[in-house]
Every structure is written in C-alpha cells, then in structure tokens.
C-alpha cells in the first residue's frame, strides 16, 4: 500500500509499504529517499511517537495514512534527575526524547524499572508518551524522581448518578492528579470536580496518603454547578441569614459559613430542611436544596438528657448524654461506668446496630430511650456471601450473630428481604435461630445466598425409555430432595439416579435454583450402569493412578476421586486427554474416554495468575491463566471473552510476537504482565 510522510518544511514523501513493515523499515525507506539517518528521524501518527520495533498495523496505519516526520536535534543537552534520597543523576537527552526514553536511560544508569519511576517537573507528573519539549524541559532542567510504591493501587470514584469509576493511583498522587485521571476517563474538567472522602472535601495540593485513602477506598464525586446560589437560614428567634452557596457545598461547609456570619460553633448547630436533620458529609444537592430554599437552624441544648442502656444480663445503666453525642462518646461513658472496652461493645436501637461516627440525633434517640448493649466476642470477623450472579458481599459479623442477624445485614447491603434469602454453608441450609458458631462458620468463610422464589412449581423428569414424570417442587429443593421424590414415584434408589439439565450432571447438595431450573423445566434421568470401568491417570512424575469410574462421571467427579487417592485439591488439577484440557462439567463419555484410557494430570501452580491484554483501541482484558498455558490457550480465552478468532490474533510481549506452541513461562510472562493484542489484517490493504 502507499502511505505519505510529511516533513516540517511541508514536503510530502510517498512510500510503498506493507502493514507488516516495522517503523524501523519505514525509516530505512525514508533514508533511501531523503538521505536522513534513521537515528535523526521521529515519526508521529495520531499524535503518538512511533516505536522502531512496532509495525504499521500495530498502530492501525492504513493505506494513504499520513505520518509526520520530525528531525531530532543534533547535539542534545544535559538534564538532571534528583531522587528522594538527594542523589542527582545527569542524563544526555534531546528535546524530542519521550518521557519513556528518559525512564529507559534512568534504568540504564540506576537499574530502576520504568514502571516504578514517576518523573515530576514543575509540580506535574510527566506522561510516558509526551516529549521533553512538550513540557518545555530545557538544558540543565532538574526533574524529580519518585518511586512508585510497587504496583500502585485501585480506588473507586462514585458519582451522584450512582456510576462507579475505577482509577489506578498511588498513595503519593495529589488530588489534582486524581482529577486529571477522572477528566481522562469521563471528560469532566477538574475545576468542575469536587471530591469527598469520609465527609471531607479534598484539596488539590494534598495527596491521597495525606487523607489516609487506601486501596479500594471509595471517593464521592460532586459536580460544581457553575455560578452558585443564595439560600436562607432561619433561626428560632426569627432572624433570617442569607448565604452564598453552591449545590455541591456540604452541610459542614454551610455550618462554617454560618459560624463566619453569626459566631455559632458548628457543633452547636443543627440544620433542618423539609423536616429532616441534615448530615455534615452530605451536600445541598443531595437534599435537593435549591436557590432561595430556607433551612431552619436549631441550637443544640447544652443541658442534655438521660438515656438507658440495657445489658444482656438484664442490668440497666443510666447515662447523661446530649443528642449531639456520637455513639463513640456513649461507649466511652459506658466504659467509665462499667469498665467494658468500647471495642467490645455493640449498641442496638430499634433493631439496628449503631455506628461509632454517628450521633444519637442521627438515630432519633431521644430522652429516656433504651439502647441494648451486646458484647462482642473479641474482635468480630469478616465473612463472605456469594450470590448466584457471582457477586461477593463482605459482612462484618461475630460468631454469636444469628442467621437472622446475618440476613438483616444482607438486607441492609443489598435490599433483599430476609424471607426471600436462603443461606447455604457446607451444603447445608442455615436456620434463622442458630448462630454462626453453631455451624462452625469461621472468619473468611463463604456462605452461598439463594433467593426463594415465592411458592412451588412443577417440573418434568424424562427417562431414557421416554416416560415423563411430573414432580411438585420448590426452587429451594436440593437435587437430593428431587431424587427422593423420584424414588417415591418410581422406586429407583437415589444412588442409581443421575439427573441432567442443560447438558450438566446435577450435584446432590445444590438446589434447583442454583441451576436456574424453573417451572416446567425438563430434567433427564439416566440410570447409573452398575459395574463401571477402569481408567488410568498419569502424573508428570510418571506415577500412574488407577480409578474406578463410569462413563457418566463428570470430570469434577474424577478430580474428586484423584483427591481421595492422592490428596491433590481439584482446583490444582488439570486433566488432559488426546491433547485437550477437560472441563469440569463434561462427562467421560462426552470425551469418548473408554475403559483403560489414560488421562494426563498436570498440576496448576497454586491458584494461577492474572494477566492483562491490551488492544489497540486501548481496551484492557483481564485473563485467568497459568504459567503452563500455551499461547494457543491464551488466544482461546481471548476468543471466549471477545469473540476474536485465534487466527486473527497476534500477541506481542516485550516487543516480541508470541508463538502458539510456546507457554507463558517460556516467555517469562508473570502475574499482572500486559500483552498487546494486534489483529491480523486479512490479506493486504
């Protein structure tokens, strides 16, 4: 195909190229035509400097595209790089060098990998693809080198519309940097962004670590409406104060403005709008407070009130408090009276556990209200609840919590009424009145949440003879229950029944709703053949294991038998037959595995690893892989996720195209490495 190269003088050169030509090849063609040495050429396309080792198709350069040629200045210049230890490094550079090039030079001198380097000039973090001249970095300028804490971290930014944005950041990033990243993702100018964390508005010049923002923290993004507005604040004496505000101001900001005008400390102010007490961390727009709205200001009484605290032993304690006291303050008063450390206290009011940072008035606790005090078994713990959609919820619980309490916490988080929740642990449905410790549920255990569909339903079971049986069931029935119903109707013992739905063999401990079996679904009943057959499993050490199996056994069943014999957990086993990796849900007969066949057992390196695949559109795909996966396997996983046939995929790592038959470990591709995916153009262009 033909492409054009435009020089700074305005001259246009025409070149004959192919999509597979490297940038290096193109520079050689320019040298042939114009006599300019490749090392003095910089080629730019779509605003990006092109790298020698990449191809035209990598950059999606098509026929009749125009590249721009910039000449490198001869001679270059010196710049200095100062590290946090105070050491200064001198580098030979050119104005046209990219920040990436500069980091490579620092790596040559100091051995610091580029991905751990952050370069700062004039208070700004420098981006890899930009050049020194883009930032007006001149000879003898000094850059500052900050090391990235390994790998950075992810934080979330939640907008008022409920959308959540994920950002890659570092503790040392300033709020200004974070706003710039949000602008890159969402297009919102930084001057219209207000970021809130823990009820505080974040200041541009401070860093995430200044605010103790850690990995997976959630910031709230509020948009500044241009212009602001006036609101009125009416006191109990009848006086009205006028304030200049913005919809994005927090209640805390408003109280500060009232203090400026009237001298009333914020902690003595309670603001009421539409009958509701306003919380410090929320904004005016959260409460739909618009221009010329009127808030009511009530002063907190200094005198306070009495409340009662009832313990599980039946003892009642009387406390002197104020509506503005936090739950933390109340716990401290209980400690003074009873000697119970606050971290062992849980306070309950109106069936809700009270949070330390909230006040009594937040919970509408009034004089002579009674709180209930429950003691924490030291420390509490976290457990996980996995839903059928695959979502995992984290709960703070204690061994003494009842299943009922746990369902209430799930309702708080997810809005699912307790009477629609069924919790399963170790294959057992959990009963409301029992505690977590009754079921030996320990920290970081995972419960499974199944939703009860209201009422029962009919399903059909079809036998191999063609007979159809009708059963009355509920979505919450286990497969074991269903087999018992079949035994009642047909006299077939459960251990001779195999039930199949949507091509999958159903497991006894799972429920119909686990498999999305709905009313009038049809299951297939297959009788287990008595007798079975033997197969062999060969390990990488050369050891051969003999197993008694049936053609109808699933690969999952086979892995369980291997675990029984050899102690290898199923999630570390990969079984290979006829060169194919076998999938858990399929049966031996699906793969035509017959008596005395030999399977090969490969151990997964514990847990596998994640890698990233970046496309030319900038999209990043995350894959679960193992070092022993071949490039062919990886392409198949990409096809599963993205629908791109393997024969149209080219994978690049460290500038090298990866070959199908080699493994990830052959190329030293480790966890969280990034591969680049280039699509093969069919034919020429």
Swiss-Prot record:
Changing residue 60 to R: Decreases affinity for UBE2R2 in CRL2(FEM1C)-UBE2R2 complex. One of its GO terms (molecular function) is RNA binding. There is a cross-link at residue 76 (Glycyl lysine isopeptide (Gly-Lys) (interchain with K-? in acceptor proteins)). Changing residue 65 to A: Prevents phosphorylation in case of mitophagy. Decreased localization of PRKN to mitochondria. Gene3D superfamilies: Phosphatidylinositol 3-kinase Catalytic Subunit, Chain A, domain 1 (3.10.20.90). PROSITE patterns: UBIQUITIN_1, UBIQUITIN_2. The modification (Microbial infection) ADP-ribosylthreonine is found at residue 66. Changing residue 7 to D: Impairs ubiquitination by CRL2(KLHDC3) E3 ligase complex. Changing residue 72 to G: No effect on ADP-ribosylation. The record marks 68 as: Essential for function. Residues 685 form a propeptide. The record marks 54, 72 as: Interacts with activating enzyme. This is Polyubiquitin-C. The gene is UBC.
């Amino acid at each position: 195909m033909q492409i054009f190269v435009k020089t700074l003088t305005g001259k246009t050169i025409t070149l004959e190229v192919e999509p597979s030509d490297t940038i290096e090849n193109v520079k050689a063609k320019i040298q042939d035509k114009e006599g300019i040495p490749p090392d003095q050429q910089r080629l730019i396309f779509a605003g990006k400097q092109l790298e020698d080792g990449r191809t035209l198709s990598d950059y999606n350069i098509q026929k009749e595209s125009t590249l721009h040629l910039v000449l490198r200045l001869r001679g270059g210049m010196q710049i200095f790089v100062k590290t946090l230890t105070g050491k200064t490094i001198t580098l030979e550079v050119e104005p046209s060098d990219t920040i990436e090039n500069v980091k490579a030079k620092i790596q040559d001198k100091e051995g610091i990998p580029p991905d751990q380097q952050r370069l700062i000039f004039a208070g700004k973090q420098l981006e890899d693809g930009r050049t020194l001249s883009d930032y007006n970095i001149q000879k003898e300028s000094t850059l500052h080198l900050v090391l990235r804490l390994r790998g950075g971290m992810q934080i979330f930014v939640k907008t008022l519309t409920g959308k959540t944005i994920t950002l890659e950041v570092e503790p040392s990033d300033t709020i200004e940097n974070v706003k710039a990243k949000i602008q890159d993702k969402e297009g919102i100018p930084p001057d219209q962004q207000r970021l809130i964390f823990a009820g505080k508005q974040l200041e541009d010049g401070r860093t995430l670590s200044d605010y103790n923002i850690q990995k997976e923290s959630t910031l709230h993004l509020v948009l500044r409406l241009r212009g602001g507005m006036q609101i009125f604040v009416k006191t109990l004496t009848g006086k009205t104060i006028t304030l200049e505000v913005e919809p994005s101001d927090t209640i805390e900001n408003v109280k500060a403005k009232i203090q400026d005008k009237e001298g009333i400390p914020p902690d003595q102010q309670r603001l009421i709008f539409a009958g509701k007490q306003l919380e410090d961390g929320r904004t005016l727009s959260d409460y739909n407070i618009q221009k010329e709205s009127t808030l009511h200001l009530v002063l907190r009484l200094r005198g306070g009130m009495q409340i009662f605290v009832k313990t599980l032993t039946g003892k009642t304690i009387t406390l002197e408090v104020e509506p503005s006291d936090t739950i933390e303050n109340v716990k401290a008063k209980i400690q003074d009276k009873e000697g119970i450390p606050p971290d062992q206290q849980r306070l309950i009011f109106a069936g809700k556990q009270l949070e330390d940072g909230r006040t009594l008035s937040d919970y509408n606790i009034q004089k002579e209200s009674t709180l209930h005090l429950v003691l924490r078994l030291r420390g509490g713990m976290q457990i996980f609840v996995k839903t059928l959609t695959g979502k995992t919820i984290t709960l703070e619980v204690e061994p003494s919590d009842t299943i009922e309490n746990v369902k209430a916490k799930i309702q708080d988080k997810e809005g699912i009424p307790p009477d629609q929740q069924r919790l399963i642990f170790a294959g057992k449905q959990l009963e409301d009145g029992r505690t977590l410790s009754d079921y030996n549920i320990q920290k970081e255990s995972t419960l499974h949440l199944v939703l009860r569909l209201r009422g029962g339903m009919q399903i059909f079971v079809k036998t191999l003879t063609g007979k159809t049986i009708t059963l009355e069931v509920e979505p919450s029935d286990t497969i074991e229950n269903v087999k018992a119903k079949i035994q009642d109707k047909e006299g077939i013992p459960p251990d001779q029944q195999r039930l199949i739905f949507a091509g999958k063999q159903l497991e006894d401990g799972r429920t119909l709703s686990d498999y999305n079996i709905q009313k009038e679904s049809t299951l297939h009943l297959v009788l287990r053949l008595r007798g079975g057959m033997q197969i062999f499993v060969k390990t990488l050490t050369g050891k051969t294991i003999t197993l008694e199996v049936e053609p109808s056994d699933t690969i999952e069943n086979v892995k369980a038998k291997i675990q029984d014999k050899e102690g290898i957990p199923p999630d570390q086993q990969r079984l290979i037959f006829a060169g194919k990796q076998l999938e858990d849900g399929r049966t031996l007969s699906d793969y035509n595995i017959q008596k005395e066949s030999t399977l090969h057992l490969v151990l997964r390196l514990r847990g596998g690893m994640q890698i990233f695949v970046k496309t030319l559109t900038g999209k990043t795909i995350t894959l679960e892989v193992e070092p022993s996966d071949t490039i062919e396997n990886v392409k198949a996983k990409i096809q599963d996720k993205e629908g791109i046939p393997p024969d149209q995929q080219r994978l690049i790592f460290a500038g090298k195209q990866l070959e199908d038959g080699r493994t990830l470990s052959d190329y030293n591709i480790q966890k969280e490495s990034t591969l680049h995916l280039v699509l093969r153009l069919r034919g020429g262009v």
